[in-house]
Amino acid sequence: AFHEGNASMKPLLGGKGAHLAEMTSIGLPIPSGFTITTEACREYLASHVLSDALWAEIRSAMDQLEQREQKRFGDPDNPLLVSVRSGAVTSMPGMMDTILNLGLNDRTVEGLARLTGNERFAYDCYRRFIQMFGDVVLHIPHALFEKHLETVKREEGAASDRELSAAGLKRVAAASLKTVKE
């Protein structure tokens, strides 16, 4: 958890992780979270396997996060959404990958819509998650997802993403999910 580190731990936590830990330790209001260490990353990059011990640590950190946030990862009624952000010891703006809204799926997006009272917001988050996951994890060309977005914008006569309806964003999410599954 962020409260377990501080700014001096950049080599272990990366710059982002160390700064989040420091902000937590001085009491700034930041979202709850945890950092997977650079050591764990190196181990994974060397073996391409997440060890049982690391899985157990991640599960424990997620359990603690669920308790703090009073939400559950994968719960269709009260979903916990997390962001996965890569980091480095030195700042490299725009060079590191991010996946937002991890935890959304066809069931949890409906729960998010109910919780927020905003179906459009929920489906915008979902389509963005699918796009980021496809791009960052599966290396699907970004242009394929943009094509779905542009098609629906044209169908709805929308000049920008913000003008799309909830139904339009549902169609973008469905088309994007189909691209990922293919």
Predicted regions, residues:
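Nucleotide/phosphate-binding sheet-loop regions of phosphoryl- and nucleotidyl-transfer enzymes
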Residues: 1-182
